[in-house]
Amino acid sequence: MLLLPIGLFGCGAKKKYAAADVSVISFSCSSMSYTDSYVYSLKKENEEWLFDADYSYDYENPRVEFENKKVSAQDAAAILDVVKEQGLILQAQKYKSPRIKAFVLDGGGYFLYFKMNDGTEINAEIYNEDLVNELRTLAEKCRKS
């Protein structure tokens, strides 16, 4: 008798994903300051990794924007290693939006998004400095190439 109510209320675990299941990862920061806002996106298409970025690399130079830059499997693996080491997929799955949306005029808003190989989308308003640093490193590498 007790098994029936447990099953009805969804006590089943969420599907566990690994970094290898990621087909798209995107991280962005929105800010009142244009130079502090950025968007990075890494996606796998036809067994190739493509990288998009829109950011400022310093306060004196214009924005850098590029789309669909081919990056090596090693560069993609460095990003996915951070995802794995920091447990970012599980963090994003566990994320719950705040009930009260507080609005801070100059507060940065961070957004992490995953699309998995099976089409599942996972997103959360969380920040991870290691991920940002790795994405920024890849963006700079692409900018200079």
What are these regions (language model features)?
Residues 1-9:
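Sec-dependent bacterial lipoprotein signal peptides
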Residues 11-32, 93-145:
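Short, well-ordered, aromatic-rich surface patches in folded extracellular/luminal domains
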Residues 54-91:
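A short-motif feature that recognizes glycine-rich, charge-decorated loops
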Residues 11-62, 66:
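N-terminal export/targeting and maturation segments
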Residues 39-43, 65-73, 119-130:
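Short amphipathic beta-strand/extended segments with alternating polar/hydrophobic composition
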Residues 34-45, 72-75, 94-104:
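Phosphate-binding glycine-rich loops and adjacent basic patches that engage nucleotide phosphates
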Residues 47-50, 74-80, 129-142:
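Short, surface-exposed linear segments at secondary-structure transitions and domain or protein termini
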